[in-house]
Amino acid sequence: MLNDTTSKDYEYEYDQEQYSDLLNVPVDCPAGNCFSNDAYLIVLLGLYSVIFLVGVPGNTLLAWVTWKESRHRLGASWFLHLTMADLLCCVSLPFLAVPIAQKGHWPYGTAGCWLLSSITVLSMYASVLLLTGLSGDLFLLAFRPSWKNADQRTCGVRVVQVSSWMLALLLTVPGAVYRKLLQEHYPPRLVCGTNYGGSVTAEVTITTVRFLFGFLVPLVFMASCHGILQRQMARRHWPLGTAVVVGFFICWTPFHLLRVIIAVASSHSPLLAWALEAEPLVTGLALAHSALNPIMFLYFGRKQLCKSLQAACHWALRDLQDEEESAVTKVSTSQEMVSEMPV
């Protein structure tokens, strides 16, 4: 997916850390089913364009709506932070599209290589950590009565949101350290890639950290929270909070699994060849998540879509409030029934 020259002696170039840089097209095709370079470029440029055209205005509108709502509804602040993370990714896409159009040549220098790759990785980590916090918030609302206290919850949510961004930044740094401008000779060009200097330990460590903290641990936690909440909900439906979490993992699961395959597959193996061929499509799916939340808001607010996009987003946020109130009401009712039972 991304340009990379690493310790693996292989005819394909790939990036072990970033996910939104230029995707290198395979230079040979053991399976005999590669697309042409031009076809890959057209698909990638088209995909980046769609994500940018949907994601930037969509997330901008969503940021405005959630900012206004967050002054009255604490739950809306989660989506404000998520929207900012998605917007970071979306605004970087035109810059990342230029190397694609130039068939791999990186025009932004060393600083641009480090900065653009860091922005997109930061967006990924921030999104998954904020979604983890949102899931925990909904779970505590349902099963910890004291969490309903306005002051306590407000303080806790703010701390988690700030901590999510700080931890995301911290997790971004190790991979950024290995981002370098690399000189290729066939064809001659400068590429922005990852160079571990032959350190297998560094490569495995960064891949493992990204997989655990960017995927597996949040997945287990969120699946547990929303699975329990779904059983407790007074209404049987897919609420906005759950839908956003599911959308994230639909987009990102193939990417994380493919990165593990690329990290552990032996050089020259058919498995590595297949993984690198699949990489452009998988990366595109992951990047598409940054434009997904505005679409979800329009779907959940479709009853008000005839009025305006802003009205639809406002209506969708009501679903989150209903989700919070439904979980709290369900648990409160259960507790009342228990307290009324004869001893």
UniProtKB/Swiss-Prot annotation:
Residues recorded as bearing Phosphoserine in the entry: 326
Membrane topology qualifier: Multi-pass membrane protein
Coarse class of the protein's main subcellular location: membrane
Entry keyword annotation includes Transmembrane: yes
Subcellular localization(s) per the UniProt record: Cell membrane
Cytoplasmic topological domain: 68-78, 144-155, 232-243, 301-343
Transmembrane region(s): 45-67, 79-101, 121-143, 156-178, 209-231, 244-266, 281-300
Disulfide bonds: 113-192
A single Gene Ontology CC term: plasma membrane
Residues with glycosylation annotation: 3
GO biological process: complement receptor mediated signaling pathway; G protein-coupled receptor signaling pathway; inflammatory response; negative regulation of interleukin-6 production; negative regulation of neutrophil chemotaxis; negative regulation of tumor necrosis factor production; phospholipase C-activating G protein-coupled receptor signaling pathway; positive regulation of cytosolic calcium ion concentration
InterPro entries per record: Formyl_rcpt-rel, GPCR_Rhodpsn, GPCR_Rhodpsn_7TM
PROSITE patterns: G_PROTEIN_RECEP_F1_2 (PS50262)
Extracellular side: 1-44, 102-120, 179-208, 267-280
Keywords from the named record: Cell membrane, Disulfide bond, G-protein coupled receptor, Glycoprotein, Membrane, Phosphoprotein, Receptor, Transducer, Transmembrane, Transmembrane helix
One annotated GO molecular function: complement component C5a receptor activity
Family, per entry: Belongs to the G-protein coupled receptor 1 family.
Protein purpose: Receptor for the chemotactic and inflammatory C3a, C4a and C5a anaphylatoxin peptides and also for their dearginated forms ASP/C3adesArg, C4adesArg and C5adesArg respectively. Couples weakly to G(i)-mediated signaling pathways.
Subunit details: Interacts with C3 (the anaphylatoxin peptide C3a and the adipogenic hormone ASP); the interaction occurs with higher affinity for ASP, enhancing the phosphorylation and activation of GPR77, recruitment of ARRB2 to the cell surface and endocytosis of GRP77.
Full protein name: C5a anaphylatoxin chemotactic receptor 2
